[in-house]
Curated annotation (Swiss-Prot):
Subunit structure: Interacts with SAK1.
Keywords: Acetylation, Nucleus, Phosphoprotein
Functional note: Involved in RNA processing and negative regulation of glucose repression. Regulates the level of two antigens, P43 and P70. Binds to protein phosphatase type 1. Functions with REG2 and SNF1 protein kinase to regulate growth. Might regulate SNF1 directly or indirectly.
GO BP annotations listed: cellular response to glucose starvation; protein catabolic process in the vacuole; regulation of cellular response to glucose starvation; response to unfolded protein
Record's compositionally biased regions (Low complexity): 104-115, 722-740
Positions where Phosphoserine occurs in the chain: S75, S242, S254, S311, S421, S490, S570, S572, S576, S610, S614, S680, S898, S980
Compositional bias per record (Basic and acidic residues), positions renumbered to this chain: 11-34, 247-260, 959-972
Modified residues (N-acetylserine): S2
Modified residues (Phosphotyrosine): Y480
Cellular component terms per the entry's GO annotation: cytoplasm; nucleus; protein phosphatase type 1 complex; vacuole
Record lineage: Eukaryota, Fungi, Dikarya, Ascomycota, Saccharomycotina
Modified residues (Phosphothreonine): T73, T896
Protein name listed in UniProt: Resistance to glucose repression protein 1
Entry-linked InterPro entries: AreA_GATA (IPR013860), Glucose_repression_reg (IPR052292)
Length: 1014
C-alpha cells in the first residue's frame, strides 16, 4: 500500500481500468481472483453496515469523474505538493446514488467480476465515510483495537511560544506530537511547527539558554501576535497533583487563551485551600478517627441519658419543680465547681474532690489523671472551659461563687477525713453519689471529646453522623385531690431546711445524674460558714431530722418530698450544709413551691425488625404487631412493637392460640347479613305495626266481578298485600326484599300463599300468566318476584294477540334488573285487584300513586281487558330490608298522599278504582263522566285498550246486561288489530302520568254506580 492516498489512486490506475473493462465485458480476471478469492454475494455482510459505492464506468473519463473526492476541510492546499496534479479528483457526481442499483443488477451475471468489484469497493469504503484526512496506513486502520490501545489524550492545549514549560512536559508533548504525526492523525503542517517549537523549547530549557529578543528576528510582537497552540502532556509521576494545580489555575470554564492569563497570579496564592471539595469525598485517616471518637461520645451521652430516665423509676415521687430544666441546672452546678478563687485551699479541696470522684466513677476518666492528682491542673482548666461554655448568666455565677466560698471552707474542715478514709463508699446512698460523680466526669468527657480548647466555648461541634432518632419520650399527668391544697403551707414549712440544705449541697432531683442548684439564692455571708465549723455534727443531725420529717409528711399527702437517704451528703466532706441562720435567711428568698402536674416516665425506643426477631417473643404469631401496609415490597414482615411504646395493659390486644391477622379479600363486606336483617326487620315491623289501623283497601268491583275473577282463575292481586313503608312519592314502584309469612292473610287462596312463600330477591319479572292462570297473585308478588325454578306451579305467559299460552320458557325465567320496553310479542305486566274482603269504604280511602305508568282498567261486563303497558326504570331504595313475614301487606298510609311502594315494573290494573272527574277511569268506562272528558284524547286511549283486549268467549257468558256492549268492543278489537302496541303504550303512559296522581278520596264515592260500564 502506498503511503499517500493520491499516489495510491495513481498507482492503481491500471487496476482500475481493468475493473472498468471487466464490468463492461463481463469477463473474469485472474489477477483480481488472486487478490480476493472465494468472495460471493453471500459474503456481503463482511463489508459492514455501509452501502456499496461501486460504480459502473463506461470509460476512463467517466470513471475519473465519478470517483470519490476526499475533501479536506482545513487543507488550504498545504498538501498539494504531495498530490499528482494529473490525478486530482474533481468530486463525486450526484448520479452516483442513481447508479447504485446497476451494480447489483449486473452482479448476478458473473461471480468473479463481483469478487473484483467487492475488492475495488473495499479499497474505497474506508475513505468515503470521513470528512477529515484519512490515514494512509490502511493496514493499521483496519486492525481492531481493544482497551490496551486506548491512549490518554491531553486535556489542555497551550501556547507553545509563551508557555512556561517543565522539562518533563516538553519531552512528553514532543513524543505525543511525533506519534500523532506518524499516524497521520494531525495536521502535518501544524504538527511540524509544534515539533519544531517543542524541540527548541526543550533545547533552551536543557542548556539554560536565554530568550531571543523579538527585534533580533524582526518580529513586531505588539502588532503581530502569533499563537501556536498544541497539546501539553503532563508528567505521569506527578499527574494527580499537577492536574489539580493546573485545574485551579485555569479556573472553571476558561478557554486556552484565558488559562494562560489566569495561571500567572494564582501560582503564588494558596489555591489548594480555596479549592471546592469534591463531590465524592474520600475520608482521610484523621477524619475516620475523629468520626469514631464522635460516635463513641454520642453513645456515652445516650447511655447517660438512659440512666437519667431510668432513675425516675427508682424515685417516681421525687422533688419536682419548675426548675427541672436539667441542662440549665447542670450548668449552674458545674459553675460553682469551676468558678472558684485561685487559692491553695480551694485547690486542695478540689484535688480531694476529684480524687474521690475517680474511685466512685463508673465512666473512665478521659484526662488520664491518677490517684495522686497528677493531672488535676489540666482537668481544672478543662472543667473551667466547660463551665464557661454552659454558663448563661453572669449574675448567677456571682451568686454561686459566694456559695462556693462557704462550701470551700466546709471542705477544708473535712479534708483529713476524706483523704484518710479507707472506704470511699461512705454515702448512705452510694448509688446516688455515684450518679452525681459520674455526671461530673461526664461533663469533663463531653468537653474533651467535643470541644476545641480555643473554640468550643463559642461554637459547638457539628455532628456529621446522619442518624434517625427512635427515642420516645413518655409522660403522665398527675392529679391531686382537692384536700391536698390545704396542706401546702405545712409541707413548705417542713421542707424549708431540707430544700435549703439540698440547694447548698447540690442534691439530685428525681435521683437523676444531673446535679441541681437553686437559682434565686442570695449571697450568704462567709462568717456563717465559719460559724458552722463548730456546729457541723449538730447541723447534720438537724438536716437529717428535717428531711425525715418532710419525707414522712410528703408520703402521707402524696406531695413533693426528698428522701432521707439523699439528705445525708455531708458525711462525704465534699458538700457540707450551711448554718441554720443562713438556712432561714435563704429560705425566704428560695424558689416557691409549685405542685407538678406532669410526671416523666422512662423513655423507650421504637423496636422494629424482621420476622426473625419475633421468634423469641411470648407469642408465636405476629398478632397486631404486623404492619397494616400490605402494599409494601419488603421481602420480610415488618414488625412494630406497640407494647414497647404503650406500657399499659395490652392483654386484650394479644392474639390467642397463635392467631394471625389475614387480609380480607376484595369485594367482601365485613357487615354481616344477620345484622342487616335484624335492623331491617326492626324497621319494617315497626312500620307495619304502626300503620295496621290505617290500612285503606281497594274496593271490590262487585260480587259478580269477584266471582268471575275467581272462576276464571285470572292472575289477580290481593290488595291486602299492598302497603308501603315509605312516604315518598317517587317510590311508587320500587324494588323491595320483604319475605314475610303472616297468618292474617289466611283467607287468600292456596296459589297465592305458594307464590308469596317463594317471593325473594330484588328484581323485576314478568307476570306468569294473563287471563287463564289459576293463581291469584297480589301486589306483593310484583315487589317480590319468585324464582321460577323454586315455584312448583309454573304459569306460562299468555300471548297478547291470540290469547294463547306462550310456551317460551325464557320468558318464564326472565328476571330483569332494569325494565325493558314492551314488544308486541312479549307478555304483559298486569295489576289485578282480587280481594274478596275489600269494602267500599276502604276503597274510597285508597289514593293512587302519582308517578307511575299504570293503566287503570275497568272490569267490563262479561269480559276482561288487561292492557299491555311498557316498563319504567325506577330508583332503588337506599335500604332494602327483609322481613320474615311473607304475607305482610303493603298498605298506603291513610293520612299521607304518598304513593304505594311496590316492586313491580309496569302493571295493568284489572278491577275497579272509583274514578274522579276527568280521570282515565271515567273515560274508559264510558260512564256518566264522558261528557266532561277530552274526547279526542280519551277516544285514542280507549281505542288502545280495545286493541289490547284479549278475546275470551268463555268469560263473556258470566257477564251481566253489558254483554252486548262488550261484544261490540271485541269486534272493534278485531277491526283495529293492526294498531301498534307501541303507540298504545305511549298513550297509556302519558295519560297515566296525567291523571293517576289526581285521584282523591272525596271523588271516589259518587262513582260506584259506574263499575260495570265500559
Amino acid at each position: 500500500m502506498s503511503t499517500n492516498l493520491a499516489n495510491y489512486f495513481a498507482g492503481k490506475k491500471d487496476i482500475e481500468n481493468e475493473h472498468v473493462n471487466r464490468n463492461a465485458s463481463h469477463e473474469s480476471n485472474s489477477k483480481s481472483d488472486v487478490k480476493i478469492s472465494g468472495n460471493d454475494n453471500d459474503n456481503d455482510e463482511d463489508m459492514g453496515p455501509s452501502v456499496s459505492m461501486a460504480v459502473q464506468a463506461k470509460n476512463d473519463d467517466d470513471f475519473h469523474k465519478s470517483t470519490f473526492n476526499l475533501k479536506r476541510t482545513r487543507s488550504m492546499g498545504l498538501l498539494d505538493e504531495y498530490i499528482d496534479p494529473t490525478k486530482k479528483l474533481l468530486g463525486r457526481s450526484d448520479d452516483l446514488y442513481d447508479n447504485d442499483n446497476e451494480y447489483y443488477d449486473n452482479s448476478s451475471n458473473n461471480s468473479s467480476s463481483n469478487s473484483s468489484d467487492d475488492d475495488y469497493d473495499d479499497g474505497y469504503q474506508e475513505h468515503s465515510t470521513s470528512v477529515s484526512p484519512p490515514p494512509a496506513d490502511n493496514d493499521s486502520y483496519l486492525i481492531p483495537q481493544d482497551d490496551n490501545d486506548v491512549v490518554v489524550e491531553p486535556e489542555r492545549h497551550v501556547d507553545y511560544l509563551s508557555h512556561e514549560w517543565k522539562e518533563s512536559e516538553i519531552s512528553n508533548s514532543w513524543k505525543y506530537i511525533i506519534l500523532k504525526k506518524k499516524k497521520r492523525d494531525v495536521d502535518l503542517v501544524n504538527a511540524a511547527r509544534l515539533e519544531n517549537a517543542s524541540w527548541r523549547t526543550w533545547a533552551k530549557a536543557r542548556n539554560n539558554l536565554k530568550t531571543v529578543s523579538p527585534e533580533v528576528v524582526n518580529w513586531s510582537k505588539d502588532s503581530d501576535v502569533t499563537w501556536l497552540y498544541g497539546p501539553i502532556v503532563r508528567d505521569s509521576e506527578g499527574n494527580a497533583q499537577s492536574e489539580e494545580e493546573h485545574d485551579l489555575e485555569r479556573g472553571y470554564g476558561s478557554d486556552d487563551e484565558n488559562s494562560k492569563r489566569i495561571s500567572m497570579p494564582t501560582k503564588n496564592s494558596k489555591s489548594i485551600a480555596a479549592a471546592p471539595k469534591p463531590i465524592l469525598k474520600k475520608r482521610t485517616v484523621t477524619e475516620i478517627i475523629e468520626d469514631n471518637a464522635l460516635w463513641k461520645l454520642n453513645e456515652a451521652r445516650k447511655h447517660m441519658t438512659e440512666m437519667k430516665h431510668a432513675s425516675v423509676i427508682m424515685d417516681p415521687n421525687g422533688n419536682k419543680n419548675v426548675h427541672d430544666d436539667f441542662d440549665a441546672l447542670a450548668a449552674q452546678v458545674n459553675a460553682q465547681y469551676y468558678h472558684y478563687p485561685k487559692e491553695s485551699n480551694s485547690s486542695v479541696s478540689l484535688k480531694s474532690q476529684h480524687s474521690d470522684k475517680k474511685d466512685n466513677s463508673t465512666i473512665p476518666n478521659p484526662v488520664g489523671e491518677n490517684s495522686n492528682g497528677g493531672g488535676d491542673k489540666g482537668e481544672e482548666d478543662l472543667h473551667l472551659k466547660s463551665a464557661l461554655h454552659v454558663q448563661n448568666n453572669r449574675s448567677t455565677a456571682q451568686s454561686n461563687k459566694s456559695i462556693l466560698e462557704n462550701s470551700t471552707n466546709d471542705r477544708k474542715a473535712n479534708l483529713d477525713q476524706n483523704l484518710n478514709s479507707p472506704d470511699n463508699n461512705r454515702f448512705p446512698s452510694s448509688t446516688s453519689s455515684s450518679n452525681r460523680d459520674n455526671e461530673n466526669n461526664s461533663m469533663g468527657l463531653s468537653s474533651i471529646l467535643t470541644s476545641n480548647p480555643s473554640e468550643k466555648s463559642n461554637k459547638p461541634t457539628k455532628n456529621r453522623h446522619i442518624h434517625f432518632n427512635d427515642r420516645v419520650e413518655q409522660c403522665m399527668a398527675l392529679r391531686y385531690p382537692a384536700s391536698q391544697s390545704e396542706d401546702d403551707e405545712s409541707d413548705d414549712e417542713n421542707k424549708q431546711y431540707v430544700d435549703v440544705n439540698n440547694n447548698a449541697n447540690v442534691t439530685t432531683i428525681n435521683n437523676n445524674r444531673t446535679p441541681l442548684l437553686a437559682i434565686q439564692h442570695k449571697s450568704i455571708p462567709i462568717n456563717s460558714a465559719t460559724e458552722h465549723l463548730n456546729k457541723n455534727t449538730s447541723d447534720d443531725d438537724t438536716s437529717s431530722q428535717s428531711s425525715s420529717s418532710s419525707h414522712s409528711d410528703d408520703e402521707e399527702h402524696g406531695g413533693l418530698y426528698i428522701n432521707a437517704r439523699f439528705s445525708r451528703r455531708s458525711d462525704s466532706g465534699v458538700h457540707s450544709p450551711i448554718t441554720d441562720n443562713s438556712s432561714v435567711a435563704s429560705s425566704t428568698t428560695s424558689r416557691a413551691h409549685v405542685r407538678p402536674i406532669i410526671k416523666l416516665l422512662p423513655d423507650t425506643t421504637l423496636n422494629y425488625g424482621s420476622d426473625e426477631e419475633s421468634d423469641n417473643g411470648e407469642f408465636n404469631g405476629y398478632g397486631n404487631a404486623v404492619s397494616h401496609n400490605v402494599n409494601t415490597s419488603r421481602g420480610y414482615d415488618y414488625i412494630y412493637d406497640y407494647n414497647s411504646v404503650y406500657t399499659g395493659d395490652t392483654s386484650s390486644f394479644l392474639p390467642v392460640d397463635s392467631c394471625d391477622i389475614v387480609d380480607v379479600p376484595e369485594g367482601m363486606d365485613l357487615q354481616t347479613a344477620i345484622a342487616d336483617d335484624n335492623a331491617s326487620n326492626y324497621e319494617f315491623n315497626n312500620a307495619v305495626e304502626s300503620k295496621e289501623k290505617h290500612v285503606p283497601q281497594l274496593h271490590k268491583a262487585s260480587a259478580n266481578n269477584t266471582t268471575r275473577q275467581h272462576g276464571s282463575h285470572m292472575l289477580l292481586y290481593d290488595d291486602d298485600n299492598y302497603s308501603s313503608s315509605s312516604d315518598s312519592e317517587q317510590q311508587f314502584i320500587e324494588d323491595s326484599q320483604y319475605n314475610s309469612s303472616d297468618d292474617e292473610e289466611e283467607e287468600d287462596d292456596d296459589d297465592q300463599e305458594v307464590d308469596d312463600n317463594h317471593d325473594e330477591g330484588l328484581s323485576l319479572r314478568r307476570t306468569l300468566s294473563l287471563g287463564k292462570s289459576g293463581s291469584t297473585n297480589s301486589l306483593y308478588d310484583l315487589a317480590q318476584p319468585s324464582l321460577s325454578s323454586a315455584t312448583p306451579q309454573q304459569k306460562n305467559p299468555t300471548n297478547f294477540t291470540g290469547g294463547k299460552t306462550d310456551v317460551d320458557k325464557d320468558a318464564q325465567l326472565a328476571v330483569r334488573p332494569y325494565p325493558l320496553k314492551r314488544n308486541s310479542s312479549s307478555g304483559n305486566f298486569i295489576f289485578n285487584s282480587d280481594s274478596e274482603e275489600e269494602s267500599s269504604s276502604e276503597e274510597e280511602q285508597r289514593p293512587l300513586p302519582a308517578n307511575s305508568q299504570l293503566v287503570n282498567r275497568s272490569v267490563l261486563k262479561g269480559s276482561v281487558t288487561p292492557a299491555n303497558i311498557s316498563s319504567q326504570k325506577k330508583k332503588a331504595l337506599p335500604k332494602q330490608p327483609k322481613a320474615s313475614d311473607s304475607s305482610q301487606s303493603f298498605r298506603i298510609v291513610n293520612n299521607t298522599p304518598s304513593p304505594a311502594e311496590v316492586g313491580a315494573s309496569d302493571v295493568a290494573i284489572e278491577g275497579y278504582f272509583s274514578p274522579r272527574n276527568e280521570s282515565i277511569k271515567s273515560v274508559v268506562s264510558g260512564g256518566n263522566m264522558m261528557d266532561h272528558q277530552d274526547h279526542s284524547e280519551m277516544d285514542t286511549l280507549a281505542k288502545g285498550f280495545e286493541n289490547c283486549h284479549i278475546n275470551n268467549a268463555s268469560k263473556l257468558k258470566d257477564k251481566k246486561v253489558d254483554s252486548v256492549q262488550t261484544t261490540r268492543k271485541e269486534a272493534s278489537l278485531t277491526d283495529s288489530s293492526n294498531e301498534s302496541l307501541h303507540k298504545v303504550v305511549q298513550n297509556a303512559r302519558g295519560m297515566a302520568s296525567k291523571y293517576l296522581h289526581s285521584w282523591k278520596k272525596s271523588d271516589v264515592k259518587p262513582q260506584e254506580n259506574g263499575n260495570d260500564s265500559s
